Amino acid sequence: MPRKGLRPRDRRALPEADYKYDSVLVARFVNKINFEGKKATAEKIVADSMVIIADKTKEDAMTVFNRCIETVRPLLELKARRVGGATYQVPVEVKPLRSTSLAMCWLLDAARSRKGRPMAEKLAEEIILGSKKEGAAFKKREDTHRMAEANRAFAHFKW
């Protein structure tokens, strides 16, 4: 039996703006990189990669980072819906907070999959490529959109 009205949603607080770059986006990115509670290491990786980005592109690192997140953010994603014994991949729109989180995860996965260099260099390279609409993270976005387009026939199953 459904409840009357909607239940209040769990609202997780966003982190405070990063002290160095004064950006909530960077603070969230540091938290995504954070591994085994070593936040200082995560902050150092982000700071070093921002320096590398500024050196390589001759642009403001925050501008490149923001452009990268915007280009890698997905607009659609696939959700599995079970209807009558069959499972369909249904394309649904992605909420803004989730789309930025997905973009950050894809950037990190792409950087981690590169081998042989320090994490700051790999991350900087992936951010630069993402801002130019290239690289593995952008490819992941394009693949997701392509799959959503292919499964457009099942869009009427979203509820």
Swiss-Prot record:
A Gene Ontology cellular-component term: small ribosomal subunit
Xref: Pfam families: Ribosomal_S7
InterPro entries per UniProt: Ribosomal_uS7, Ribosomal_uS7_bac/org-type, Ribosomal_uS7_CS, Ribosomal_uS7_dom, Ribosomal_uS7_dom_sf
Superkingdom of origin: Bacteria
Keyword field: Ribonucleoprotein, Ribosomal protein, RNA-binding, rRNA-binding, tRNA-binding
Disulfide bond sites: none
Cited Gene3D superfamilies: Ribosomal protein S7 domain
One annotated GO molecular function: rRNA binding
Entry's Gene Ontology BP terms: translation
Function recorded in the entry: One of the primary rRNA binding proteins, it binds directly to 16S rRNA where it nucleates assembly of the head domain of the 30S subunit. Is located at the subunit interface close to the decoding center, probably blocks exit of the E-site tRNA.
Assembly description: Part of the 30S ribosomal subunit. Contacts proteins S9 and S11.
Protein family: Belongs to the universal ribosomal protein uS7 family.
Protein name per Swiss-Prot or TrEMBL: Small ribosomal subunit protein uS7
Protein source organism: Elusimicrobium minutum (strain Pei191)
Higher taxonomy: Bacteria, Pseudomonadati, Elusimicrobiota, Elusimicrobia, Elusimicrobiales
